[in-house]
Amino acid sequence: MSFRPEYKEYFKQGATARIYNGAFEDAGFYDEVDIKEFEYSREEKTFYYPCPCGDRFEISLEDLRNGEVVARCPSCSLIVCTVYEAEDLEKYL
C-alpha cells in the first residue's frame, strides 16, 4: 500500500490551522492516529509512526504526559494528531 497519492492530495488541499474558541479546529493534521498504532522505543522514550514521505512521525513520552497531541515528521511538514487516554501511557512509565 502506498501513501503517496494521499500525501500529494493533502498538499493540494491547502490545509491551514484554524482556532475556534481558543482550541485548534482542523489544525492541518494529516491524520488522527491512536497511540496503540505507534511503535515505542524504550531507549529513546519516543513513539514513532510511519510518514508517507518515508520517514516517521515522532512524539516523546514526556510530551504526551504533558498533554501534547501533535506528532511531527522531522523530514517534511506533515503532522498527525495522536489520540490517547492517560491510562494508555501507564505501561510506558
Curated annotation (Swiss-Prot):
The keyword Lipoprotein does not apply. GO terms for molecular function: ferrous iron binding; iron chaperone activity; oxidoreductase activity. Pathway: Protein modification; peptidyl-diphthamide biosynthesis. It comes from the Eukaryota. It is found in: Cytoplasm; Nucleus. Fe cation binds at C51, C53, C73, C76. Pfam families: Zn_ribbon_CSL. PROSITE patterns: DPH_MB. Residues 29-85 form the DPH-type MB domain. It catalyses: [3Fe-4S](1+)-[protein] + Fe(2+)-[Dph3] = [3Fe-4S](0)-[protein] + Fe(3+)-[Dph3]; 2 [3Fe-4S](0)-[protein] + 2 Fe(2+)-[Dph3] + NADH = 2 [4Fe-4S](1+)-[protein] + 2 [Dph3] + NAD(+) + H(+). GO terms for biological process: protein histidyl modification to diphthamide; tRNA wobble base 5-methoxycarbonylmethyl-2-thiouridinylation. GO terms for cellular component: cytoplasm; nucleus. InterPro entries: DPH3/4-like, DPH_MB_dom, DPH_MB_sf. The keyword Nucleus applies. Keywords: Cytoplasm, Iron, Metal-binding, Nucleus, Oxidoreductase. Its main location: cytoplasm. Its cofactor is Fe(2+). Component of the 2-(3-amino-3-carboxypropyl)histidine synthase complex composed of DPH1, DPH2, DPH3 and a NADH-dependent reductase, predominantly CBR1. Required for the first step of diphthamide biosynthesis, a post-translational modification of histidine which occurs in elongation factor 2. DPH1 and DPH2 transfer a 3-amino-3-carboxypropyl (ACP) group from S-adenosyl-L-methionine (SAM) to a histidine residue, the reaction is assisted by a reduction system comprising KTI11/DPH3 and a NADH-dependent reductase, predominantly CBR1. Acts as an electron donor to reduce the Fe-S cluster in DPH1-DPH2 keeping the [4Fe-4S] clusters in the active and reduced state. Belongs to the DPH3 family. The DPH-type metal-binding (MB) domain can also bind zinc. However, iron is the physiological binding partner as zinc binding impairs the protein electron donor function. This is Diphthamide biosynthesis protein 3. It comes from Encephalitozoon cuniculi (strain GB-M1) (Microsporidian parasite).
